[in-house]
């Protein structure tokens, strides 16, 4: 129940970088 939040943050950061 912790990696789920990490994955969402990673996806949001990737979209901003792209």
From Swiss-Prot:
Detected in seeds (at protein level). Coiled coil: none annotated. GO terms for molecular function: peptidase inhibitor activity; serine-type endopeptidase inhibitor activity; toxin activity. It comes from Mesosphaerum suaveolens (Pignut). It comes from the Eukaryota. Keywords: Protease inhibitor, Serine protease inhibitor. This is Trypsin inhibitor HSTI. GO terms for cellular component: extracellular space. Inhibitor of serine proteases. Can inhibit trypsin but is ineffective against chymotrypsin, papain and elastase. Strongly inhibits the trypsin-like protease activity isolated from the third instar larva of P.truncatus, and also inhibits more weakly the trypsin-like protease activity isolated from the third instar larva of M.sexta. Protects the plant by inhibiting proteases of invading organisms.
């Amino acid at each position: 129940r912790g990696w789920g939040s990490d994955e969402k943050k990673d996806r949001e950061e990737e979209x901003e970088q792209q």
